Amino acid sequence: MEEVDGCAGPNSEAGALTAGALTAGAFAVTAGAGVAGAGVAGVGWCSWCSWCSWCWCSWCSWCWCSWCWCSWCWCSWCWCSWCWCSWCWCSWCWCSWCLSKGWEDRGGLEGCKSCKGWCLCSHCWCWCSWCWCSWCSWCLSKGWEDRGGLEGCKSCKGWCLCSHCRCWSIN
């Protein structure tokens, strides 16, 4: 998966990150390869991300960017307490809860048995029928579409996170 406007998709080869053991919430996450990163290992919670020149939203004190998947918060809750890193971004889904609900991970973000769109499983990185972003003019201006969030893109074949919002698009 190639970069788009500075955004490395989750399966990008742009610097696979091997993080240390991260314990957050009720989950102990040991991250493996498969994360597009800047070479940081085992970083802690922080209100500013040195690999990112801006925060993803003006009302949030936590910085987010595509290079720092593992150790940052998305405002009111934290991805790391589930399984950011390598679980569902990789070629197989490690989340039995997800699979038990009839979801499947075929190469990361390619399929779901029971949904029409994509949504983030609260236990891992499987997507189906849910939207991070109701409107992103920058995203749309680049030819990306937001039809309920994660359903389509005019110009790409894979998935990539928009670096300006939480919209996902095919790249």
From Swiss-Prot:
Q: What main location does UniProt list?
A: host cell
Which cellular compartments is it found in? Host membrane
Q: Which GO terms describe its cellular component?
A: host cell membrane; membrane
Keywords of this entry: Host membrane, Membrane, Transmembrane, Transmembrane helix
Q: Can you tell which superkingdom this protein's organism belongs to?
A: Viruses
Give TM segment ranges.
Answer: 25-45
Q: How does it sit in the membrane?
A: Single-pass membrane protein
- What this protein is called in its record is Uncharacterized protein 043R
Species whose genome carries this gene: Frog virus 3 (isolate Goorha)
